[in-house]
Amino acid sequence: MDSSKKIIIVMFLVTFYMFSCVSSTEFEVGGENGWIVPKSKTLGDAFNQWASDNRFKVGDTLRFKYTKDSVLVVSEEEYKKCKATKPQLYSNNEDTVFKLDRPGLFYFISGVSGHCEKGQKMIVKVMETESSTESPPPSSSSSSSSSSSLPASTPKAKKSNAFKTAVQFSSSGFVVSAVLIVSVFGLV
């Protein structure tokens, strides 16, 4: 095989491998319970606890499932005051998907009067890079409760399927690439 064909094949394989490593995850906010008002004041920081138990990267999505409620993306000041005058996003369609399109902090609150004050709010930190080891923002409450009305370790949603598929595809892509490189260059 001439060298130009080998170069084209190697470039194709490298490109294929790079695309196979890219994946995004959809997180279901609050796990099975969804976007609800926490049941008690002691659980008022449950959404921030849920967010801190997960790692978010650019391209991931958050799915908010709720009934007779809404979700707003707001500024830090509006988050602290539980009052939004100019939300960046307002949705009340009972199934909102929000794409995390940049690194940094995102602030979410319920748009229903009184819900935010009862703890239906959340800060999500999106990592700078996949290799970053920074932690999401700490809970805004000084009390740390080990029990929560939201499953702490459940990023529920499509994470298990999407992540599993992406990892399988990445592994398969790597193996196929390695076999093709070995066969193209006659290394065996």
From Swiss-Prot:
Record localization: Cell membrane
GO molecular function: electron transfer activity
Pfam families for this protein: Cu_bind_like (PF02298)
Keywords: Cell membrane, Disulfide bond, Glycoprotein, GPI-anchor, Lipoprotein, Membrane, Signal
Domain Phytocyanin stretches: 25-128
InterPro entries in alphabetical order: Cupredoxin, ENL_dom, Phytocyanin-like, Phytocyanin_dom
Knockout mutant characteristics: Abnormally low frequency of progeny.
Keyword Metal-binding annotated: no
Subcellular location, principal: membrane
Tissue: Mostly expressed in leaves and flowers, and, to a lower extent, in stems.
GPI-anchor amidated serine lipid modification positions: 170
GO cellular component assignments: plasma membrane; side of membrane
Membrane topology summary: Lipid-anchor; GPI-anchor
Gene3D superfamilies: Cupredoxins - blue copper proteins
Disulfide bonds: 82-116
First and last residue of the signal peptide: 1-24
Function: May act as a carbohydrate transporter. Mainly required for reproductive functions.
Family: Belongs to the early nodulin-like (ENODL) family.
Name the record gives this protein: Early nodulin-like protein 5
Gene: ENODL5
